[in-house]
Structure formats: structure tokens, C-alpha cells
Design a protein with these regions (language model features):
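Short glycine-biased active-site loop of nucleotidyltransferases that positions the nucleotide triphosphate
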Residues: 94-97
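N-terminal carbohydrate-binding/catalytic regions of secreted carbohydrate-active enzymes
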Residues: 46-57, 61, 86
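Structured segments of extracytoplasmic/periplasmic soluble domains
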Residues: 57-65, 132-139
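A short acidic/small-residue loop/turn micro-motif
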Residues: 90-91
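Basic/polar, cationic surfaces and motifs that engage anionic cell-wall
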Residues: 1-41, 45, 78-82, 87, ...
């Protein structure tokens, strides 16, 4: 977690209580400006690494949850192909209550063959995501790269099933894919 204690800062805004954090209304369609983007949030689709999860599958599932369309701004498939689903300053539907101050990026996978949370990111996904986050950091230099599970006040889950801070630090500094996999796993082979 980033911080479990209140008061806390979300971006540059002081939040006095969990109630204040959770009751913020996301009533606008667009964020105010690039300065509104405080977080670049990495997600996983929470699908098995041996299961194909197409854009159409993602759209169907998000609409079934009541979203008007896919809630993420970007979706990266196992082969490294990427699709864009929201304009950059359009409010997403991926990490409530942070949707009005974040960009959501999802990679296909996140579960092993048995359905357990696991870093299943392929080399192609890692490369594409690194390029995307580099470009997003240029557009939003104040934004912090975080995993969904790192945001206090969101639904407790393992998403994105890896240590996002370590992955981002390694990838944005140009480490090899194998080194990144080692960084994101504990010595016992489980997620950090």
C-alpha cells in the first residue's frame, strides 16, 4: 500500500479520512487538465496465462458490470499488441475512487494455469508497457506509476499480480526482461 493512514495526500490533495476518500463523486466525463493525472495505474485482466482474453471479451465483461464501455485507457495483449479505449483525459472506470485522477492500463493475464495470482507478463507485454509508460510520463510528469493493489481505498485484490514499483523502476531504467522477472518475485518464487 502507498499509505494506510489518514490524513494522507492523494496527488497533491490532502485527504482527511477514508470516508472523504471513498465518497468523492466522479461526476465529470473529463479530467480538468494533464495536471489532474496523479497516477498511472497498472492492472491485469485476472485471466489465466493459457486463456485468450480478447478486447471483445473485455468489453463484454465491463458492460456486464454496468460500464458504458471498457474502463481502461489501454489494453495490452500477450503478444504485445495494444488497443486504446478512452481518450487520455477521459475519466476511466478502473480504480474507484481514483478514476478522476488516473490513467488505467491493463495487461492480459495475471493468473497462472491454476488460477492463482502470478506475474504472467510476457516479454512483448513488458516491452510495450515500458514504452507506453515512458510516453505517459512525458505527458504526465507528476504522475506516479502504481499497481491497482497499491492504491488505498480500492477493492482489495492482487492486481496487477506483480510489484509495480520495482517493475517500473527496472523497465524505465532499461533492465533486461529476465532481471525484471527476478526483481518482481521474492526468493521463494512468490510475488512481492
Amino acid at each position: 500500500m502507498i499509505n494506510d493512514y489518514f490524513p494522507m495526500e492523494v496527488g497533491e490533495e490532502k485527504v482527511r479520512s477514508e470516508r472523504m476518500l471513498l465518497t468523492k463523486v466522479e461526476d465529470g466525463k473529463y479530467m480538468m487538465s494533464a495536471d489532474s493525472v496523479k497516477f498511472l495505474v497498472l492492472h491485469c485482466s485476472a485471466t489465466r496465462c493459457n486463456q485468450d482474453y480478447s478486447v471483445e471479451d473485455l468489453r463484454r465483461d465491463h458492460k456486464a458490470r454496468g460500464f458504458r464501455d471498457i474502463g481502461y485507457h489501454f489494453y495490452v495483449r500477450r503478444d504485445g499488441s495494444m488497443t486504446k479505449h478512452r481518450r487520455l483525459l477521459e475519466v476511466g472506470a478502473h480504480a474507484r475512487p481514483y478514476n478522476r485522477c488516473s490513467i488505467g492500463v491493463c495487461y492480459e493475464g495475471g493468473l497462472d494455469e491454476n488460477g492463482k495470482p502470478c506475474n504472467t507478463m510476457t516479454k512483448e507485454q513488458s516491452n510495450r508497457l515500458a514504452d507506453l509508460f515512458r510516453n505517459l510520463r512525458i505527458a504526465f510528469p507528476k504522475a506516479k506509476i502504481v499497481g491497482h493493489r497499491d492504491l488505498p481505498g480500492t477493492t482489495p485484490k492482487e492486481c496487477p499480480c506483480l510489484d509495480t514499483a520495482e517493475w517500473a523502476k527496472a523497465r524505465l531504467l532499461g533492465c533486461s526482461f529476465q532481471r525484471i522477472v527476478r526483481i518482481c518475485l521474492r526468493k521463494d518464487g512468490n510475488l512481492k
